[in-house]
Amino acid sequence: MLPVLPPALLALADGTTFLGTSIGAPGRTVGEVVFNTALTGYQEILTDPSYCRQIVTLTYPHIGNVGVNEEDVEAAKVHAAGLVIKDLPLRVSNFRAAMPLSQYLEREGTVAIAGIDTRRLTRVLRTTGAQNGCIVSFAPGTVVGEAEIAAAVAAAKAAPSMAGLDLAQVVSADAPYEWTETSWQLGRGHGTLADAEFHVVAYDFGVKRNILRLLADRGCRVTVVPARTPAAEVFKLKPDGVFLSNGPGDPEPCDYAIAAAREIIDAGVPTFGICLGHQIMALASGAKTFKMKFGHHGANHPVKDLDSGRVSITSQNHGFAVDEKTLGANLRPTHVSLFDGTLQGLARTDRPAFCFQGHPEASPGPHDIGYLFDRFVALMQERA
């Protein structure tokens, strides 16, 4: 006999509602509802700190086929506020699976809903833009009526807007730590960096573990520092290069990070930024950012390298972008999105610093743009 799952409700701030079944923890959650078009990598997506306070809708219909393991995580816990999917398979099939997705969600306290029309939801978000929502997981046997729906819509309306939210310090580490773990290989698992050629200080605005692994793969001993670390403390560590990580929220309120990045870049330290780090570098260089209608979330985004003409398929996860009209003479565009023409990469014309809006570390997604890590290493070699 198939299990009878408790009812669940997704309500958007505009009053749009979806009834489904609960596949995670009981309770209620609110956040900005976004859609991600990746076919795989749900575990990496859930644990990506960049999804803090966001409810993630996965557009691929079957989610959970390969279960969950203890290695493919980008942080120590789930950071997404909630999960929305179409169908949860009843049988898990993968030799690395440690547990089903539903069990993992329950363990992590993540509220999730399945059995809704995710295509309709995605069309709503595409038309109206990302908006706040509320998922409620009810007790078994609950009849979801007008009162329950009204309460969920009210909760969605009351949730704070992502614009103006500084979430980097919410997800950042509390204290510095060292990172030497390298990428996973079949039959070995994760390795450990043996001989380091460079010392990189990585700002943790919500850093993904695979970024740190790819730096370690290239001979970098990484010291990860909290988001609010002043530049003076970084200089004491005598880094060969500084990395500005990905992260959630609006970059403009992160004045502490912008000030530190400006000081580090002006000092001539080789600097590489990704995602939120890209936006912080742009703000530190005098440019402005803006909130996008529904952002870029997926693993199939084509991006053009303006220097080489090469087109790469990239992983993306951001709701803000750099305004090209605000670039000064000290910044030049290096990459653009072929979906909407938004800026995807920048380089300083007067300092050894560059940044990329997407995710060259993938996890999940393609590795086409991974050469940017090699470019960072080359910058450090030039300055050695």
Swiss-Prot record:
Disulfide bonds: none
InterPro entries the UniProt entry points to: Anth_synth/Amidotransfase (IPR050472), CarbamoylP_synth_ssu (IPR006274), CarbamoylP_synth_ssu_N (IPR002474), CarbP_synth_ssu_N_sf (IPR036480), Class_I_gatase-like (IPR029062), CPSase_GATase1 (IPR035686), GATASE (IPR017926)
Glutamine amidotransferase type-1 domain boundaries: 199-384
Entry-linked Pfam families: CPSase_sm_chain, GATase
GO terms for biological process, alphabetical: 'de novo' pyrimidine nucleobase biosynthetic process; 'de novo' UMP biosynthetic process; glutamine metabolic process; L-arginine biosynthetic process
Binding-site residues, L-glutamine: 50, 247, 249, 276, 279, 317, 319-320
Reactions the enzyme catalyzes: hydrogencarbonate + L-glutamine + 2 ATP + H2O = carbamoyl phosphate + L-glutamate + 2 ADP + phosphate + 2 H(+)
Annotated active site: 275, 359, 361
Domain of life according to the entry: Bacteria
Region (CPSase): 1-195
EC number(s) per entry: 6.3.5.5
Pathway in which the depicted protein is active: Amino-acid biosynthesis; L-arginine biosynthesis; carbamoyl phosphate from bicarbonate: step 1/1; Pyrimidine metabolism; UMP biosynthesis via de novo pathway; (S)-dihydroorotate from bicarbonate: step 1/3
EC class: ligase
PROSITE patterns: GATASE_TYPE_1 (PS51273)
Oligomer status and interactors: Composed of two chains; the small (or glutamine) chain promotes the hydrolysis of glutamine to ammonia, which is used by the large (or ammonia) chain to synthesize carbamoyl phosphate. Tetramer of heterodimers (alpha,beta)4.
Function: Small subunit of the glutamine-dependent carbamoyl phosphate synthetase (CPSase). CPSase catalyzes the formation of carbamoyl phosphate from the ammonia moiety of glutamine, carbonate, and phosphate donated by ATP, constituting the first step of 2 biosynthetic pathways, one leading to arginine and/or urea and the other to pyrimidine nucleotides. The small subunit (glutamine amidotransferase) binds and cleaves glutamine to supply the large subunit with the substrate ammonia.
HAMAP family recorded: CPSase_S_chain
Similarity remark: Belongs to the CarA family.
Protein name, as recorded: Carbamoyl phosphate synthase small chain
Organism (species): Rubrivivax gelatinosus (strain NBRC 100245 / IL144)
Encoding gene (name): carA
